[in-house]
Regions:
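Short proline/glycine- and polar residue-rich coil/turn motifs
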Residues: 87-92, 101, 220-228
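Short, aromatic- and glycine-rich surface loops/edge beta-strands on solvent-exposed regions
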Residues: 104-118, 251-256
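Short, surface-exposed loop/turn segments at beta-strand-coil junctions that are enriched for proline
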Residues: 99-104, 237-241
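Histidine-bearing beta->alpha loop at or near hydrolase active sites
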Residues: 1-14, 20
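Extracellular ligand-binding interfaces
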Residues: 161-164, 169-243, 249, 257-267, ...
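Short beta-strand elements
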Residues: 118-150
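Surface beta-strand/loop "capping" patches
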Residues: 18, 22-70, 74-76, 83-99, ...
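Short acidic/polar inter-strand loop motif in beta-rich domains
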Residues: 113-124, 260-264
Length: 275
């Protein structure tokens, strides 16, 4: 048996190659398509106590690309935020560092392996508590800066505003943009913090910012030839008249245009948590 899972996917499979056609033609029609063997994987501690994924794929001469993913803490697969992780090949094994913030919390990891014929396989899902493996160390740190460049915002492209400040511009005026990285403890808001960001727009626009899809607030993006900033307390976002209790309970943030506005004309930058 085999499987492939798209990280951060939502019923979409565009990053899973040509699996369906290849599998059906091979196993139903009997055509002679190449199909790789199962990869082997395990999470270990390195010599300094940092967790790392050791991945040994099959049919390595046919590999086109390989991407490792990591998730911290939550055992609820619906709420997981999967980070992209760099890996280094060491002989027949790819090794990826998995930095953690707490050695007594779970770390999860798996990889997607794309082959030359556009078949994509996922490795097994590995889950460990690092302290159970030995003398583990926590090397990751919490970040109040949410977005550097495009960050994890969906449907955006890199953009530069006045003064050379790097940010992002939403590309789809119908879908807007969304960020789901806040279930990761690295980017979860500190209690009683506020959301701050900068924006650059030379034409006035109106947008709706929401948290967890339910709590919303209307924002006026005023026109200016300079960067502007905005700071939002959690209670400003409402759902049926009730304010968001705290930014720390937010797992996702979305920004959508109001009817008649064009969000693609707005450049956003430097989303961060502030006191």
């Amino acid at each position: 048996w085999d499987f492939a899972v798209q990280a951060r996917g939502h019923h979409n499979t565009e990053k899973l190659g040509d699996n369906c056609r290849l599998w059906l033609e091979k196993h139903v029609l009997g055509e002679k398509h190449f199909w790789p063997g199962r990869p082997q994987s395990i999470i270990k501690l390195d010599s300094k106590g940092v967790p790392e994924l050791h991945l040994t794929p099959a049919n390595q001469a046919e590999i086109k690309e390989l991407q490792v993913y990591q998730c911290l803490k939550t055992s609820n697969n619906i709420a997981r935020f999967w980070r992209d992780v760099d890996s280094v090949r060491q002989g027949n094994t790819w090794v990826a560092k998995l930095p953690v913030m707490n050695v007594d919390d779970y770390v999860f990891s798996y990889a997607n392996i794309r082959y030359q014929n556009d078949c994509v396989l996922s490795s097994g899902f590995e889950a460990v508590i690092p302290s159970n493996l030995g003398k583990a160390v926590a090397t990751d740190k919490k970040s109040d800066l949410i977005s550097d460049g495009t960050g994890q915002w969906s449907h955006v492209g890199p953009a530069e505003g006045v003064g050379g400040v790097q940010g992002f511009r939403p590309l789809d005026n119908r879908r807007g943009t969304r960020n789901i990285q806040f279930s990761d403890p690295k980017w979860k808001a500190p209690r009683e913090s506020k959301l701050s960001f900068r924006f650059y727009c030379t034409q006035p626009q109106k947008v709706v910012l929401s948290a967890n899809r339910r709590f919303t607030t209307d924002l006026e993006i005023t026109a200016s030839n300079d960067w502007q900033s905005m700071t939002l307390p959690a209670k400003q976002l409402l759902s049926h008249g009730v304010g968001l209790s705290d930014w720390s309970v937010a797992d996702s943030i979305s920004i959508m245009p109001k009817p008649g506005s064009d969000i693609t004309k707005v450049v956003f930058a430097e989303f961060k948590w502030v006191e």
